[in-house]
A protein has these predicted regions:
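Short, low-complexity disordered leader/linker segments with a strong preference
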Residues: 1-37, 340-349
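Pocket-lining segment of extracytoplasmic ligand-binding domains
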Residues: 99, 131, 174-271
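Conserved C-terminal helix/tail region of periplasmic/extracytoplasmic solute-binding proteins
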Residues: 306-349
């Protein structure tokens, strides 16, 4: 999984969307055989457990119950989610992290986040087992392997929060070999990807530091919709959001096997063991259900969190300070406690 390559939204060619957003026209023609509204949702990478809630909503019929016939289209190399939204090729898209909606605003491309599946961005720093590194603060001054995209993304926060400096940067090419042969190495990773790969390949459990647990304020795994759909068909957006929330709650706290079967069918390279360990980590680290989501419901977002993220990034020059960051999201479709009753039902003894 190479979603780390997309951590900095600069790799998304949102400027192209400026030319074509006016082409969007809501498709209100139902599928004749089902009477359901057809919708296409494109993800940010190949099918995996981190997309499980969406697949569960398909497999368990939650989208159908909401009057929707949803097709999930896998992302991957060369798949530009904002551009697909812009030309109307898809109805909804997945945004990997908080940079994506803000970059869309910076490009004046007319789309926003309507839900954040993950309260915690699963970005991590990884070390070998060692006594001298027990926190992110301990890494100050040490060489760290990060991707080019990361330098203008969460590395900005590490500099601001922990005093990291650019002379610590070493290039990460998504090859584990340099890390495995150097016991002093530190590298970036994705919570459910590199740590498990290291365990399988090298036979040891690395130390994993989830940035979100050290204050990193970004959300992850957004649902993106263009403003035309939000304005013209808010009821469709709400139906998609609610069914997705239900899918995530069912996937994380119920039986995930219906979604897992679809995930492995879409992505033959995915295996049951990788999915299983990812689900455990999503739950153990509270990736989807923690913080505001515990009271407001899965998918929650708040103005305070968005402001904190934007303030750090704009102060460091990632964005102009006068960018209308409020335009990156809407709270109209979340924070209603939807799905909390299902979670209580599934987790009750």
């Amino acid at each position: 999984m190479n979603r780390n390559a997309m951590v900095g939204g600069a790799v998304i060619l949102v400027a192209l969307a400026l030319l074509v957003f006016s082409l969007y026209s809501p498709n209100q023609t139902p599928v004749a055989e089902t009477g359901l509204r057809p919708l296409t949702f494109v993800t940010d990478w190949k099918a995996q457990a981190e997309h499980g809630g969406f697949y569960q909503a398909v497999a368990n019929g939650y989208y159908a119950d909401a009057g929707l016939d949803v097709t999930i289209r896998q992302g991957g190399p060369g798949i530009n989610v904002p551009q697909l939204l812009a030309v109307g090729s898809v109805d909804f898209g997945m945004g990997s992290n908080s940079f994506i909606p803000l970059n869309i605003v910076a490009a004046n491309a007319g789309a926003k986040a309507v839900m954040a599946s993950f309260q915690k961005d699963p970005q991590v720093l990884i070390t070998h087992p060692r006594d001298d590194v027990n926190s992110l603060e301990d890494m100050r001054g040490m060489p760290i392997m990060v991707s080019d995209a990361t330098i203008s993304a969460f590395w900005v926060w590490l500099r601001s929060r922990f005093g990291f400096t650019d002379d610590q940067i070493r290039k990460y090419t998504f090859n584990l070999a340099p890390f495995l042969v150097d016991e002093s190495a530190i590298q970036q990773g994705y919570l459910s990807s590199e740590p498990y790969s290291i365990e399988k390949e090298a036979g040891f459990t690395p130390q994993v530091f989830l940035l979100a647990d050290h204050g990193y304020p970004g959300y992850a795994t957004f649902i993106l919709a263009n403003n035309s759909m939000i304005d013209a068909e808010p009821e469709i957006v709400q139906a998609f959001v609610n069914a997705t929330i239900k899918g995530w709650v069912s996937y994380l706290y119920g039986d995930p096997s219906p979604a897992n079967a679809l995930i492995m069918a879409d992505n033959p390279d995915m295996t049951a063991d990788v999915i299983a360990q990812a689900i455990v980590k999503l739950n153990d680290y509270g990736i989807a259900m923690s913080g505001d989501a515990e009271t407001l419901g899965l998918g929650a977002m708040t103005e305070e969190r968005w402001k904190t993220f934007f303030d750090v990034m704009s102060a460091s020059g990632v964005y102009e300070t006068d960018l209308d960051w409020h335009a990156a999201y809407t709270l109209d479709f979340v924070n209603k406690g939807y799905g909390l009753d299902l979670k209580a039902e599934l987790t009750s003894e």
